[in-house]
């Protein structure tokens, strides 16, 4: 099922599900469903064949318009019906005549749609379009193909990325560590060669880690600003506490800070993906002459060179050889060679070797091709794909990279249809943008992309993660699951894959991108697009292009550090009434008031006002009953939130402001489908409202004066599916006496406690599968380690500011068997830490920010897994080679001192 037939299928499902709503127009709806079924039979492989014939393309575009228009007609009618059902009997009687008119109008609209479908089918028959489409239809049964895909396990061994690179890594490490004459190493070559992968291997190499004191990695991109690059470097090289300060620094101050820092430290800075020599000229003033710093930069352009500079060397890695390409291809495409399900014969091997020649030795293209064939189990499938790649290359041979581009392009054509929509959505984001995966999942859900494949009990995030995993396995998206939470947190696109994504999105008229760097767009083109994304917007951008009544999605994306605002006129809400997705990050409105006309956007599924300059929310928000995602975390600290949520029964994600007006009172008991609720305040809402939210996976609670921990425990004990739980309390809350909490949630993986509590709960009252724990402001009177070290799956522990008020902590032998990361922040009374031999046997990273701790524990010598130690600068002398405590840390490869 291809892109356009996917839309038809969704529409057919909707008509079937809501059939009871269409009393009085059943005949018209039945006829429409029949026409849609007929249309589906003509659409097999239409998208795959539309490049062959302009007539096919025209028909596909017309069908898209029909599907969108029909969805709008049907949904508008259903929403009106639901509103009427909520009215009193007298009001419904008064509107009886109007209801009859609504049904007549619906019958007329459906009749018009049916005529348009008949016209398209007639055109397809008259001009032979049907034959063009069906000539290339696939022989594989869709269900069987999907079952094979579901059974298949893809290889994602990190060593796959390393095939053929061993010599390159060794040489680059030598340049950085052994060759002091070279301060700048340039890694150049075409896109997809594996430059970033190679740079990452070098950046994380143990020998390199041992050589330098500080490290910074910056993705430069085509549309960078000098200040953003300098800010990122300084943030990498200094403490996390300076992040906000650095964001607000002037360019001259950034320059001076970096210049001084690089004069006095051994630092490695990677500048990934510099496009022009002029870009390097902008960045380089921060580097003092001939000091301990080194730069590794990657670029597609070999002219990124230091003219006459003897401290510079260029390195161009070779493309993969045919044998190395074949080795890499086999590891991905044939991980289970010659199983009962998958037999690789000589003919298939020959086809595979022939196809990898089209990859030109580029590791990205080889991996994508391997991902394509990994899900193909028959000789027929391999032949079809081989011919498809060949035909694409014959059709377009201009340009050096045409073969590679089309290997990547075919990877898109071979995606299951639901993944095509998911992949195209990634075109929303700027180059090198770290995409928030959770938000992406809700974009998909709001547009109905993930509706048809969600299984019982599965959350929107579960479904979305499965999509990301499939795209990662096909080497089309770069991401990995967080080892602590098992979730995908961010993802991004390789440059070449992003070019394919943008090309396909433009070809499909999937969305329109407007930014300060893009050419001026034609308003007529924008008027035909149903998705509109603004990169770093200005008021002019929106005002110029807001008159598009068919707009489905309006998304704002910021790709750099800044605190800019852009003005949005309230009149836009009266002109784009079909919006499903509205993301207004950092917007501002006249007088700080969100216009009440937003309540007219009754089709909205996704609304974000994150960091918007809004002090007042209108009560008309209650009309947005289809919302599944709502973020009203605005940039005001005393915002009044109206009580508008009881009708929003479809909400899955709700983020409230951290600080609300004291008169705010919210009823949330109807939100039984919520999967994430953030900033729930016991001052503004009742804990009783939580009892019915049994689907919650994420919950952030703010406790007010008078709320006991026992009451809280009783209210949330039924939320058995919680994975991420955070408890905070308002400043000034005074807890008298000892209070006990029970937090025994079976699936809880991440727990954050920022509340005063003299003692931890007993071990049997803590989640047994907890992997991440963050404590702050707890003022624990007893050493927490004897309890926490018994959490057998704990991997990440942070004892942040004032979490412990005692003097001594002890980590005993055998404790913390899975702990990988430990952070110990400032504790005002903490003086002594004992680590027994055999404790924390898997610890990898240790951070200590304490001015009161008298000495490091001797037991650190026996933690052989410890690779990274981060300390305050006050420890530098004691831990230097001649320092009194050096023997405790001498086996740790990387030690960093930060202010």
UniProtKB/Swiss-Prot annotation:
**Protein residues bound to ATP:** 189-196
**BP term (GO), one:** response to other organism
Q: What InterPro entries has UniProt attached to this entry?
A: Apaf_helical, Disease_R_plants, LRR_dom_sf, LRR_R13L4/SHOC2-like, NB-ARC, P-loop_NTPase, RX-like_CC, Rx_N
Sorted alphabetically, which CDD domains does this protein's record hold?
Answer: RX-CC_like
- Where in the numbering of this chain does the NB-ARC domain appear? 143-455
Any idea which GO molecular function terms this record carries? ADP binding; ATP binding
In terms of superkingdom, the source organism counts as Eukaryota
Q: Give one Pfam family.
A: LRR_14
Give the transmembrane ranges.
none
Q: What does this protein do?
A: Potential disease resistance protein.
What does the entry's domain section say? The LRR repeats probably act as specificity determinant of pathogen recognition.
Q: Which family does it belong to?
A: Belongs to the disease resistance NB-LRR family.
The protein in question is named Probable disease resistance protein RXW24L
């Amino acid at each position: 099922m291809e892109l356009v037939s996917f839309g038809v299928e969704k529409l057919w499902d909707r008509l079937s599900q809501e059939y009871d709503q269409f009393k009085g127009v059943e005949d018209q709806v039945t006829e429409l469903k029949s026409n849609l079924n007929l249309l589906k039979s003509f659409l097999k492989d239409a998208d795959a064949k539309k490049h062959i014939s302009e007539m096919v393309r025209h028909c596909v575009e017309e069908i898209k318009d029909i599907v969108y228009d029909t969805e709008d007609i049907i949904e508008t009618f259903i929403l009106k019906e639901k509103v009427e059902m909520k009215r009193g009997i007298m009001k419904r009687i008064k509107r009886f005549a109007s209801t009859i008119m609504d049904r007549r109008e619906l019958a007329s609209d459906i009749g018009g749609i049916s005529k348009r479908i008949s016209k398209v089918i007639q055109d397809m028959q008259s001009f032979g379009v049907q034959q063009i489409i069906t000539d290339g239809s696939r022989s594989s049964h869709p269900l069987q193909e999907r079952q094979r895909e579901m059974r298949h396990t893809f290889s994602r061994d990190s060593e796959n990325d390393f095939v053929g690179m061993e010599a390159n890594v060794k040489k680059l490490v030598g340049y950085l560590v052994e060759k002091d004459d070279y301060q700048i190493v340039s890694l150049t070559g075409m896109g997809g060669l594996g430059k970033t992968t190679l740079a990452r291997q070098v950046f994380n190499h143990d020998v390199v880690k041992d050589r330098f004191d500080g490290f910074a990695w910056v993705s430069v991109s085509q549309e960078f600003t000098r200040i953003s690059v300098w800010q990122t470097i300084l943030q990498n090289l200094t403490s996390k506490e300076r992040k906000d300060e650095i964001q607000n620094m002037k360019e001259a101050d950034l320059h001076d800070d970096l210049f001084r820092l690089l004069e006095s430290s051994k630092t490695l800075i990677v500048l990934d993906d510099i496009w022009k020599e002029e870009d390097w000229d902008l960045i380089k003033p921060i580097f003092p002459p001939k000091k301990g710093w080194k730069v590794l930069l990657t670029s597609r352009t070999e002219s990124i060179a230091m003219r006459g500079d003897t401290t510079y060397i260029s390195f161009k890695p070779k493309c993969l050889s045919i044998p190395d390409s074949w080795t890499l291809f086999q590891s991905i495409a044939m991980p289970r060679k010659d199983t009962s399900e998958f037999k690789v014969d000589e003919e298939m091997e020959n086809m595979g070797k022939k196809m990898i020649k089209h990859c030109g030795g580029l590791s990205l293209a080889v991996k994508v091709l391997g991902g394509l064939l990994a899900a193909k189990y028959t000789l027929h499938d391999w032949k079809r794909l081989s011919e498809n790649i060949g035909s694409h290359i014959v059709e377009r041979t201009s340009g050096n990279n045409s073969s590679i581009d089309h290997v990547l392009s075919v990877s898109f054509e071979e995606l299951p249809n639901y993944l095509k929509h998911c992949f195209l959505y990634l075109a929303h984001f700027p180059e090198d943008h770290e995409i928030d995966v959770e938000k992406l999942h809700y974009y998909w859900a709001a547009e109905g992309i993930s509706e048809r494949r969600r299984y019982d009990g599965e959350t929107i995030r579960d479904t979305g993660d499965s999509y990301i995993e499939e795209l990662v396995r096909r080497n089309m998206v770069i991401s990995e699951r967080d080892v602590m939470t098992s979730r995908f947190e961010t993802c991004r696109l390789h440059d070449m894959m992003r070019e394919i994504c943008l090309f396909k999105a433009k070809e499909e008229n999937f969305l329109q991108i407007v930014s300060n760097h893009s050419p001026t767009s034609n308003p007529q083109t924008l008027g035909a697009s149903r998705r509109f994304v603004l990169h770093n917007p200005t008021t002019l951008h929106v005002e110029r292009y807001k008159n598009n009544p068919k707009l489905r999605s309006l998304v704002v994306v910021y790709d750099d550090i800044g605190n800019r605002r852009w003005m949005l006129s309230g009149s836009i809400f009266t002109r784009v009434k079909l919006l499903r997705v509205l993301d207004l990050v950092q917007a501002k409105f006249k007088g700080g008031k969100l216009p009440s006309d937003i309540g007219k956007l009754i089709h909205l599924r996704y609304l974000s006002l994150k960091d918007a300059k809004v002090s007042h929310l209108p009560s008309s928000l209650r009309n947005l009953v289809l919302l599944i995602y709502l973020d009203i975390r605005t940039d005001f600290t005393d915002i009044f939130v109206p009580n508008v949520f009881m009708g929003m029964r479809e909400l899955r994600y709700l983020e409230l402001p951290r600080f609300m007006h004291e008169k705010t009172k919210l009823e949330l008991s109807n939100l039984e489908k919520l999967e994430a609720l953030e900033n729930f305040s016991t001052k503004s809402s009742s804990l009783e409202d939580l009892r019915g939210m049994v689907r919650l996976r994420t919950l952030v609670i703010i406790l007010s004066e008078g709320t006991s921990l026992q009451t809280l425990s009783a209210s949330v004990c039924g939320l058995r599916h919680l994975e991420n739980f955070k408890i905070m309390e308002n400043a000034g809350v005074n807890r008298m006496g000892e209070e006990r909490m029970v937090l025994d949630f079976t699936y809880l993986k991440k727990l954050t406690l920022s509340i005063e509590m003299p003692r931890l709960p007993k071990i049997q009252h803590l989640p047994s599968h907890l992997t991440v724990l963050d404590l702050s402001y707890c003022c624990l009177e007893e050493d927490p380690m004897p309890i926490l070290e018994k959490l057998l799956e704990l991997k990440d522990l942070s004892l942040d500011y004032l979490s412990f008020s005692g003097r001594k902590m002890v980590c005993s032998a055998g404790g913390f068997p899975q702990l990988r990361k430990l952070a110990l922040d400032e504790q005002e009374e903490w003086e002594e830490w004992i680590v027994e031999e055999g404790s924390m046997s898997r610890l990898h990273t240790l951070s200590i920010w304490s001015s009161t701790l008298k000495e490091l524990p001797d037991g650190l010598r026996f933690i052989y897994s410890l690779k990274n130690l981060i300390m305050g600068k006050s420890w530098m002398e004691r831990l230097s080679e001649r320092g009194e405590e050096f023997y405790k840390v001498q086996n740790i490869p990387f030690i960093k001192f930060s202010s």
